[in-house]
Amino acid sequence: NWYMPSYRQEIERVREEIEDKMREVLLKMSGFLTIGNGKNDGEVLQVLKEKLNEAREYVRLEAENHLTKEVTYDYQYFEMRRDQSKLLEIMATNLNEFRWDGEEMAILSEMFKQTAQQLAEQNTASQLIDEIEDLLEQFRERPLPQTRCEFEKRAQLYQLLRDLKRFVQLKVDFFQTYGVHYFKKVGEKE
């Protein structure tokens, strides 16, 4: 029996499902920031984790049957998404502690929404990282908090923004290492 089944369709399907779940989590976080409080039950994050495990299994099966550069790309892609999902879990936990409103919350909410809207395999995310850097700089230039409570809230916001930056930076780094070569190769096929 020389036929070796391909799991390419399953890999592509689960890739889309993972990106959809990540968008859903980011949009929920944006909503929590808009409202000023929120409780994340972690259900979507759990489904995301299951999808990442499913992807890992399909890539393993594909590697057993067809060891190609595409399989290496897939493996690294899902590892990057796994690292991002860990950051989403941290951010969700931190958001559960959030009870604040203010201009910064609206700005941060919009950044989470923008990140969700731009989340895609082929997006380099370099423009998004620049926007987050600008936002961090704007937060640094704001007047210092006057009370301990304001200080703690500002620190939470700043930490959340830094975690979002790390989330996006993982994609930027991945694309610089793997995406440029992979999408160039795919483009040459057409």
What are these regions (language model features)?
Residues 2-74:
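Non-transmembrane accessory domains of multi-pass membrane transporters/channels
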